[in-house]
């Protein structure tokens, strides 16, 4: 799902791709999925500039919905910060990019390569994702 108004997307390096749908259309459908995966990249600075836009408001609603349904919440880099902004990290141990670590207030930011706490699976960055994947695969089976 694209966190945007359209499914026609471009990466920061200019690669064009099409998402299956937009985030707005995911609202109300958490019960149909096992997990929510948030791939961070450099989303946080962009999010900060556009937090009030409809697609980002929808993102926060979808994250909360998945958390309320007890779904797996998965992410890397500053995804833990997005989860924090969504208000779902109270007391949860989170692996987070070192630059985002000071912004984690309700969750417990760690320096670990990855953390698994309750239904949260977080990796510090894209280089630590491989160490998280075996545990995530077990949880998804």
Describe each PLM feature range.
Residues 1-73, 81-93, 101-141:
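Extended, subdomain-level signal for the structured scaffold at the beginning of enzyme domains
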Residues 77:
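Catalytic nucleophile serine of serine hydrolases
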């Amino acid at each position: 799902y694209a966190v945007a108004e359209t499914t026609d997307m471009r990466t920061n390096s200019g690669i064009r791709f099409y998402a299956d749908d937009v985030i707005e259309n995911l609202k109300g459908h958490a019960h149909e999925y096992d997990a929510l995966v948030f791939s961070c990249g450099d989303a946080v600075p962009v999010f900060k500039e556009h937090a009030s836009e409809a697609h980002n408001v929808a993102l926060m609603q979808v994250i909360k919905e998945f958390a309320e349904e007890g779904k797996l919440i998965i992410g890397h880099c500053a995804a833990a910060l997005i989860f924090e902004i969504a208000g779902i990290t109270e007391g949860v141990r989170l692996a987070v990019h070192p630059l985002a670590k000071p912004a984690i207030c309700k969750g417990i930011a760690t320096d670990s390569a990855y953390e698994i706490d309750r239904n949260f699976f977080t990796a510090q960055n894209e280089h630590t994702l491989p160490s998280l994947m075996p545990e995530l695969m077990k949880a998804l089976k």
